[in-house]
């Protein structure tokens, strides 16, 4: 079954497009079989060609595959929270999810704050509003469920007791330059340390909400597919001197606590920074290894996937090559807006957030981000790499309520 599934995914559709869905997640555990089996060859061929699968890292984690459900391209739920709430569960993983997501606009908070203390006061106010709005939504949908408006959900799900209320963030990178006590982006250690303080603070506050409302809350690196552009555009109109990504052009905010998209071509330099940030989220977060084109060999894809899992603690990652599709010639490696064989215009595919879409269809902000993006050079990925030493700021277990 696995072989047939992967072969279908590798083949793509009739025009050579990769399938955007489903997005399979493969668990990389300490006993993962890295031998040159037929299924491994197919898995990493699919990874090298289309970047389809996600990889969940359990090698440097205290979690087991049964502790997590990956709901989509971004949402990962820690089922240990359900055990703490209910005293145990059987099969609850298929009955969980998120009732809603609220994304906090960090650059605006930093821009308006007088100092770091004022930043946290303003952040708390926004988080309080987010938590209360999620509680109102939960109460509303539960009422509608009980009144019979969602009969199929009622039949198969039963209720929303095992669903999380999710709070996320956008623009940690731009919050640094807008903060008058920092004036530096996430490429600087001072802002990285500030980001750690912010994420820890948000986790602690979510724990308070769990006790206050009696519901499950989690912290997510929200994809912000349209939010990253929409918030930046509105902020720029209201506060002309606020700093966004790509000053002087189409404004956007960098997703969650990611580095500037044009910062480096060294994937390990980016991983070293992201490793201490992404482990602080209690819900979805992902590191996309953006590649200019498909890797030349499935073994190179396997080596890179293995190296990341064995040297880093970040929980979720992808290899994301850019590819193009010609209506006549089919799949083309890399970014080729015109087919080199027949001269027709093509569709160029890359991950907009968690899934692949033609870049010609992206919103203005994401299109600008794509133009600014540096792809990673991974030619030396097969050689051993020493990751940054473990730091005290790293945490992998979520805060419970």
Label each PLM-derived region with a short phrase.
Residues 322-341, 347, 351-401:
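Intrinsic, low-complexity terminal and presequence regions
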Residues 77-79, 172, 360, 397:
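Sequence-pattern detector for short linear motifs
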Residues 1-161, 182, 188-341, 345-348:
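Conserved catalytic cores of very large enzyme subunits
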Residues 95, 159-175, 344-361:
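Conserved phosphate/anionic-ligand binding catalytic regions in large, soluble enzymes, centered on
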Residues 182-197, 362-376:
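Short alpha-helical "patches" and their helix-cap loops
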């Amino acid at each position: 079954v696995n072989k047939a599934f992967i072969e279908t995914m590798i083949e793509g559709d009739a025009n050579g497009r990769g399938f955007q869905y489903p997005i399979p997640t493969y668990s990389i555990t300490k006993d993962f079989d890295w031998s040159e089996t037929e299924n491994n060859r197919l898995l990493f061929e699919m990874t090298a060609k289309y970047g389809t699968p996600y990889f969940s890292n359990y090698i440097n984690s205290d979690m087991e595959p049964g502790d997590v459900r990956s709901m989509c391209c971004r949402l990962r739920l820690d089922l240990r929270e359900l055990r703490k709430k209910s005293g145990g569960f059987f099969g609850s993983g298929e009955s969980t999810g998120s009732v809603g997501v609220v994304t906090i606009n960090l650059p605006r908070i930093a821009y308006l704050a007088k100092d770091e203390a004022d930043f946290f006061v303003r952040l708390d106010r926004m988080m309080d509003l987010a938590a209360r709005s999620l509680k109102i939504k939960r109460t509303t949908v539960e009422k509608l469920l009980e009144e019979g408006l969602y009969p199929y959900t009622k039949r198969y799900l039963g209720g929303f007791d095992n669903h999380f209320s999710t709070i996320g963030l956008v623009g940690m990178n731009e919050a640094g330059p807008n903060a008058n006590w920092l004036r530096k982006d996430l490429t600087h250690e001072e802002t990285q340390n500030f980001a750690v303080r912010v994420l820890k603070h948000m986790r602690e506050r979510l724990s308070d909400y769990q006790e206050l409302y009696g519901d499950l809350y989690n912290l997510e690196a929200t994809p912000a597919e349209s939010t990253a552009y929409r918030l930046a555009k509105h902020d720029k109109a209201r506060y002309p001197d606020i700093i966004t990504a790509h000053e002087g052009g189409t404004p956007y905010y960098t997703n969650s606590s990611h580095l500037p998209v044009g910062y480096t071509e060294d994937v390990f330099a980016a991983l070293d920074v992201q490793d201490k940030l992404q482990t602080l989220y209690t819900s979805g977060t992902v590191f996309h290894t953006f590649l200019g084109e498909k890797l030349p060999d499935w073994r190179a894809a396997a080596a890179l996937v293995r190296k990341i899992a064995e040297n880093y603690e970040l929980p979720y990652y992808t290899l994301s090559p850019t590819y193009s599709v010609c209506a006549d010639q089919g799949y083309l490696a890399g970014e080729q807006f015109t087919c080199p064989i027949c001269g027709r215009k093509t569709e160029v595919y890359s991950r907009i957030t968690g899934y692949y879409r033609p870049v010609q269809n992206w919103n203005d902000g994401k299109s600008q981000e794509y133009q600014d993006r540096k792809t990673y050079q991974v030619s030396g990925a097969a050689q051993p790499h020493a990751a940054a030493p473990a730091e005290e700021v790293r945490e992998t277990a979520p805060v419970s309520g």
